[in-house]
C-alpha cells in the first residue's frame, strides 16, 4: 500500500511548558496530519532521557518520558490544581536543565493525590507492567538517592544487586518507588489516549526503538547477564560505528553490547518482551541500527575513540526467526543505513522488513552507496532526511556546489526549488512508504536540525514555532493525492 507520513518528535511540538507534550498540541497535530491526508506520524524514542538529552540513551527500554506528561490533562482529572499548573512560557529551544528542576516538584503533587486515591486503574497498570515497572522505579529511586550518579558509580552492593542491599533499598525508598510508578501511569494514560485519537482519525504512530540500551539504565542493572559485562556490572566492550567518510574516528556510542549466546539460550525472551511492548504502544516500530543483529562493531571499554574496534557476529536469522514466530512478520521498519555487507542484506531480505532510503544521500559525494531513486525497492521507506540529517534546505545551503548542482540536474529544478523537488522525488518514487520531516515541508534551514551525530551541545532542542496553516495541509494533501499515497485512492 502506498502511503506517506510526517516525521515530528513529540518534544518538538509547540506548547506552553518548555517542551512538546501529549496535550492538546499533539491532538491538533493529529488533526493536521488527517487534513493533509497522511497515514503516519513518525516520532523518535519516547523513553526518559538523562545527561546529553538523547532519546537514544534512555534510562529504560520500556518507560515513558516524564517531560512529555501534560500538566493540563492532570488538572482535568483533579490531580493538579489550576494554581499548580505553571504559567505558559514562549515556545523556543528546549531547556532540559529547567525541566529537570521543575518537573519532579509538580509531578510529585499529582502522584501524591493519585496514590492517596487508591485508583483501580493505577493498580491494574502496575500489575500489567510489572515485568519492567518495579525494577525501573527502584532503579530511578536508587539513582536519585545516589545524587543521580551513573550506574557504574554506584556502591558495589547496589550496583550488583546484592539481595540484602536490594531488600533494604525497597524498604528505605518505598515512597520514591511509588512516585516513579505513578509518573509512568500518568505518561501511559496520556499516551494511550493520544494513540486512540490518532487511530480513530486514520493516523498510525510509527515509533522508534534503539537497538542498544544505555549504560545507565534499569535494563542493564536488572539483567547484566544479558550484556557483555564482568562480574561486577562493568562493561567489557561497548557499541559504536567504525570510521567512515562522515566521521574519521568513527562513532563511540558507549552502549552495552549484548551477550547474544545468552539471549539465544533464552530464546530471545527479553527482546520478545521489548518488541511486544513496542508494538502495543506503536502501530509500526522502527528498529534503529538493524544491521547490528547480523554483526556489530565492538570497541574495548575505555577506548577514547571507535577506531580500535572490530566486527563480531550477531544472532542473524535466529533472531529474526524468533521474532517472527512470537510476534508475526509485519509492523517493523529496519533502519539499514551505513555499512552493509552481503550478509546484512541477506538478513534484511529474509526478515521481509522494509529498509530505509535517504534522498539526501543520493546526491552526497561522500556517500559510497547508491541512494538514487531508481534503485529503491517497493518494500522500503524513503525520507528526504532523518533526525540525524540537516534539513533539506540546510543541505542545499551547506553541501558542496558540485553536489547541489548534481541534485538540481537530476531533479530538474533550480537551486531555490530543491527542497520541494526532493519532497516530490520521495513521494513519486516506488517506495511503499514516504516520510517527510515537518521541517522540510516548512522549508526550514539548519536552525531546525534535530541532531548532529557525534556532537555535544544544541541537539534534541528544536521546537516548532511556525503555524501549521490550512494552506500547508492542503498543499501536502494535494501532493499526497497526486502521487497516489492516499490509502483507498491508489491506482
Residue ranges and their predicted role:
Residues 44, 204-206, 210, 284, ...:
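Outer-envelope exported proteins of Gram-negative bacteria
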Residues 1-11, 27:
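N-terminal regions that are enriched for targeting/export leaders
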Amino acid at each position: 500500500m502506498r502511503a506517506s507520513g510526517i516525521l515530528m518528535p513529540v518534544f518538538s511540538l509547540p506548547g506552553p511548558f518548555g517542551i512538546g507534550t501529549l496535550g492538546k498540541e499533539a491532538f491538533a497535530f493529529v488533526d493536521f496530519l488527517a487534513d493533509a491526508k497522511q497515514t503516519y506520524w513518525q516520532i523518535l524514542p519516547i523513553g526518559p532521557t538523562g545527561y546529553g538529552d538523547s532519546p537514544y540513551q534512555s534510562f529504560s527500554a520500556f518507560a515513558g518520558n516524564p517531560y512529555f506528561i501534560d500538566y493540563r490533562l492532570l488538572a482535568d482529572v483533579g490531580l493538579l490544581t489550576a494554581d499548580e499548573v505553571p504559567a505558559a512560557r514562549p515556545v523556543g529551544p528546549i531547556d532540559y536543565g529547567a525541566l529537570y528542576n521543575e518537573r519532579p516538584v509538580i509531578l510529585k503533587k499529582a502522584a501524591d493525590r493519585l496514590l492517596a486515591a487508591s485508583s483501580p486503574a493505577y493498580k491494574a497498570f502496575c500489575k500489567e507492567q510489572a515485568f519492567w515497572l518495579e525494577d525501573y522505579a527502584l532503579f530511578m529511586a536508587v539513582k536519585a538517592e545516589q545524587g543521580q550518579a551513573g550506574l557504574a558509580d554506584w556502591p558495589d552492593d547496589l550496583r550488583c544487586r546484592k539481595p540484602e542491599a536490594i531488600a533494604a533499598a525497597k524498604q528505605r525508598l518505598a515512597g520514591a518507588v511509588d512516585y516513579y510508578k505513578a509518573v509512568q501511569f500518568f505518561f501511559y494514560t496520556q499516551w494511550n489516549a493520544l494513540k486512540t485519537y490518532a487511530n480513530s482519525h486514520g493516523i498510525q504512530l510509527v515509533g522508534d526503538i534503539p537497538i542498544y540500551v544505555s549504560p545507565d539504565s534499569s535494563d542493564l542493572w536488572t539483567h547484566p547477564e544479558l550484556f557483555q559485562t564482568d562480574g561486577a556490572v562493568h562493561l567489557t566492550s561497548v557499541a559504536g560505528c567504525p570510521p567512515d567518510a562522515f566521521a574519521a574516528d568513527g562513532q563511540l556510542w558507549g552502549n552495552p553490547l549484548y551477550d547474544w549466546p545468552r539471549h539465544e539460550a533464552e530464546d530471545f525472551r527479553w527482546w520478545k518482551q521489548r518488541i511486544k511492548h513496542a508494538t502495543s504502544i506503536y502501530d509500526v516500530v522502527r528498529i534503529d541500527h538493524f544491521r547490528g543483529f547480523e554483526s556489530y562493531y565492538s570497541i574495548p571499554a575505555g577506548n577514547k575513540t571507535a577506531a580500535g574496534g572490530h566486527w563480531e557476529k550477531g544472532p542473524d536469522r535466529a533472531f529474526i526467526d524468533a521474532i517472527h514466530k512470537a510476534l508475526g512478520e509485519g509492523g517493523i521498519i529496519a533502519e539499514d543505513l551505513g555499512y552493509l555487507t552481503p550478509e546484512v542484506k541477506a538478513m534484511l531480505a529474509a526478515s521481509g522488513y522494509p529498509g530505509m532510503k535517504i534522498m539526501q544521500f543520493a546526491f552526497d559525494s561522500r556517500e559510497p552507496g547508491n541512494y538514487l531513486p531508481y534503485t529503491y525497492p517497493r518494500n522500503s521507506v524513503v525520507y528526504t532526511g532523518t533526525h540525524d540529517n540537516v534539513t533539506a534546505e540546510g543541505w542545499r545551503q551547506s553541501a558542496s556546489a558540485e553536489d547541489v548542482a548534481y541534485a538540481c540536474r537530476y531533479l530538474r529544478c533550480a537551486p531555490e526549488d530543491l527542497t520541494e523537488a526532493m519532497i516530490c522525488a520521495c513521494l513519486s518514487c516506488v517506495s511503499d512508504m514516504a516520510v517527510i520531516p515537518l521541517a522540510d515541508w516548512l522549508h526550514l534551514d539548519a536552525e531546525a536540525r534535530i541532531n548532529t551525530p557525534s556532537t555535544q551541545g544544541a541537539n534534541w532542542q528544536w521546537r516548532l514555532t511556525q503555524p501549521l496553516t490550512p494552506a500547508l495541509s492542503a498543499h501536502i494533501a494535494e501532493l499526497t493525492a497526486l502521487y497516489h499515497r492516499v490509502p483507498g485512492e491508489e491506482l
